Amino acid sequence: LRFRAPPGVVGAAYNEIGVAAVAMGGGDILPALEKGAIDAAEWCCPQPDSVFGFQKVLKHYYLQGLHQVVVNADFYLNGDVYDSLSATEKKALEVAANASLSKSQSYRIGTNGAALKDLTENHGVILEDTPADYFTEYMAAAKKLLEEAAAENEFFAEVWQSQKDFADIVVPFWAGAQTSNASLG
């Protein structure tokens, strides 16, 4: 399987589990699929995927992935510029960023739900369940690569440990909340 995936740890983890990860920009995915240069692809979520036209070639959609479970908007500002801002301006940026994130997540949930419905009802796309063994295999491969990176880079190890500590706290709650929320529909 030749699969368009991001480079770095993500692509390396796919390679570890026997998937030939191919890195390419978004605009190259559909032509690569049409020419048979790749067999499958990931990009984002139903709405952007449908805008790119993947449904013209791909008819099986797997929503549940691991390497990117959320999409968040990013805002970058030069550190010197940020430092030159007043406390009020910094607070205004913080409030605007938080409001934007909240609105963005609500918007994405709605537009992606509508796009998934359109893909399945109007374009012959079949929504598939990701095989359970994918999750354990991918996570084992990713963990191996992350442990190797942590052994080579002290700062990476510190950040990764912080992320694991955070996950130990939030994952049990969030997984449980999402399971119960899913049962409402």
Question: What label would you give each PLM region?
Answer:
Residues 1-185:
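N-terminal secretory/targeting leader peptides
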